[in-house]
């Protein structure tokens, strides 16, 4: 179910992204099946290292029936496919994986291995030698498919019903983004899910992914705030400040309004 009281009614792809409609993706995951779902998410780099030049990177977990059988010696259930559709359950992803996937959406469908080092030199008086660009791979999506997702992400930020509406207010550039909120516990009856009323370790994880300018992307950002509450009210405003710092002169940066939770 959705956290929106009364539901969202009938929605299309664009509205499902803009308004963060969980039930749309429950249905989509069931229609796809976990095998196809797993294969598509792997194209974006989930369940594997990003290739960044750092030691200790973990691949995360892209759950599947095979993975669960090896890990727990248990069968896969349809309900686990359903919650995989919104990135919950056994999923484990890193901020770097989210950044790589977001950049793939923004750049036209190429997954590029991440790196920190751009050039090296052997001494202070030696010339810098650029590091060779790592080869990119196609995620296998058509231009039309990518544009559908990009349109939905832009609607999330620049339409009144979009979960990121308040984050983008006053921005001189267009943002494409998606808020996310990961619950640590299940909703039970009338128990309040307001993170402010929960112990710290049970509060939601707040996420935001995005890129800008939407029509000609120059930067992709990811913000994850552990136990931070909601993506729209906690992670999103941080991302806006990052985008402003990168894209605007300091005098033009605008502090986003805090939305109502």
Question: Predicted regions span which residues?
Answer:
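Extracytoplasmic/secreted cell-surface and envelope-processing proteins
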Residues: 25-27, 230-233
């Amino acid at each position: 179910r959705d956290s929106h009281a009364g539901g969202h009614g009938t929605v299309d792809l664009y509205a499902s992204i803009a308004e963060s409609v969980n039930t749309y993706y429950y249905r989509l995951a069931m229609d796809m099946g976990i095998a196809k779902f797993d294969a598509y998410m792997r194209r974006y780099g989930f369940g594997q290292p990003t290739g960044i030049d750092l030691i200790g990177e973990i691949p995360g977990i892209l759950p599947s029936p095979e993975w669960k059988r090896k890990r727990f010696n248990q069968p896969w259930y349809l309900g686990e496919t359903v919650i995989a559709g919104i990135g919950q359950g056994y999923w484990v992803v890193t901020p770097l994986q989210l950044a790589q996937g977001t950049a793939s959406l923004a750049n036209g469908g190429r997954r590029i291995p991440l790196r920190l080092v751009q050039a090296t030199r052997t001494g202070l008086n030696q010339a810098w030698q650029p590091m060779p660009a790592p080869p990119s791979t196609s995620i296998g999506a058509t231009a039309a498919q990518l544009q559908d997702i990009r349109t939905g992400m832009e609607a999330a930020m620049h339409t009144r019903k979009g979960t990121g509406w308040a984050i983008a207010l006053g921005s001189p550039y267009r943002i494409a983004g998606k808020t996310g909120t990961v619950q640590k516990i299940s909703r039970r009856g009338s128990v309040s899910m307001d993170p402010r009323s929960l112990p710290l370790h049970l509060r939601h994880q707040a996420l935001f992914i995005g890129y800008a300018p939407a029509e000609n992307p120059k930067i992709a950002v990811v913000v994850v705030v552990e136990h931070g509450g909601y993506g729209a009210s906690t992670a999103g405003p941080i991302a806006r400040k990052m985008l402003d710092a990168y894209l605007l002169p300091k005098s033009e940066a605008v502090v986003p309004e805090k939305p109502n939770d």
